[in-house]
Swiss-Prot record:
NCBIfam families: L28
Protein name per UniProt: Large ribosomal subunit protein bL28
Superkingdom to which the source organism belongs: Bacteria
One GO BP annotation of this record: translation
HAMAP family per record: Ribosomal_bL28
Keyword Magnesium: no
Amino acid sequence: MSRKCELTGVGVLYGNNVSHSQRKTRRRFEPNLRSVKFTSDITAGEYRLSVNARCISSVEKAGGFDAYILKADDNVLSSNARAIKKKIIQTKTAKSL
């Protein structure tokens, strides 16, 4: 399992620990990933995704999982999230016809 958010694409960053004497040692900054179950109102399904903690509040602010994933750019979404987005779009167009 990669250390990457499936909705925002945020991954591991690299930097330095810097001591008081200015010695620098390499370190990793890992995202605060959580396994969250999102419910889609359009498809009436539940989807479990690995997302960072900031993304959870972004989804709520956008008006829910469906609104967030429909606005999201396909380049940052994981392949699993792109498949969910495609399913939501297909269901939405089928309901509107």
